[in-house]
């Protein structure tokens, strides 16, 4: 008879997207509906699917949720969010992408069952920490401001560093 081991939990992996625009000195922020943190604000994003590159996930999720086409998508940073009392542990890969203004440059609520409206919000004016979805409070608590930080060393990096990656 095999000994009973406690279940092994693994963190989820999501991609969040800091959507910017040459027409706005802001970032797209939406009001979340759902089972976890039902009244919180979030960036566009979602689960990374098997074999998907980070850039592809950022493009797909932003289109599915906010009906925006992106260009110049690149890695920004990673946030490890763990909240024991909620049994919540996600690694969020944050990508930064600019709205492609050759398409409609304004966000639309493409998933009204999951999200409220999407709005352009200055980074400094994001909602209070307790109203932000998990990865955002981690960034804000660390004083991170992706609009002021030098991420030039990451431009062009799309997460293709793994063995056997697609090009």
Task: For the regions a language model picked out, list residue spans one by one.
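Acidic, metal-coordinating catalytic segment for phosphate/diphosphate chemistry
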Residues: 1-16
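Short hydrophobic/aromatic beta-strand or adjacent loop that forms the aromatic wall/cage
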Residues: 12-16, 90-94, 115
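Short, well-ordered beta-strand micro-motif
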Residues: 19, 94-98, 119-122
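Conserved Nudix-box catalytic region and its N-terminal flanking loop in Nudix hydrolases
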Residues: 23-65
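Nudix hydrolase/Nudix homology domain
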Residues: 36-38, 104-167
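Structural detector for helix-capping/boundary residues
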Residues: 46, 60, 73, 121-124
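Hydrophobic pocket-lining residues within nucleotide cofactor-binding pockets
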Residues: 48, 70, 79, 99, ...
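Active-site segment of metal-dependent pyrophosphate-handling enzymes
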Residues: 67-104
């Amino acid at each position: 008879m095999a000994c009973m081991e406690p279940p092994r939990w693994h963190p989820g992996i999501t991609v969040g997207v800091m959507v910017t625009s040459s027409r706005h000195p802001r970032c797209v922020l939406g009001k979340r509906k759902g089972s976890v943190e039902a009244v919180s604000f979030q960036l566009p994003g979602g689960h990374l699917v098997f074999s998907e590159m980070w850039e592809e996930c950022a493009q797909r999720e932003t289109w599915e949720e906010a009906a925006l086409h992106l260009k110049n998508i690149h890695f920004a940073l990673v946030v490890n969010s763990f909240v024991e009392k909620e049994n919540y542990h996600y690694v969020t890969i944050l990508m930064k992408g600019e709205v492609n203004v050759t398409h409609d440059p304004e966000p639309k609520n493409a998933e009204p069952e999951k999200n409220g409206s999407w709005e352009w919000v200055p980074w400094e004016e994001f909602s209070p920490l307790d109203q932000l979805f998990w990865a955002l409070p981690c960034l804000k608590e660390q004083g991170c401001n992706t609009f002021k930080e030098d991420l030039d060393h990451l431009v062009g990096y799309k997460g293709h560093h793994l063995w056997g990656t697609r090009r």
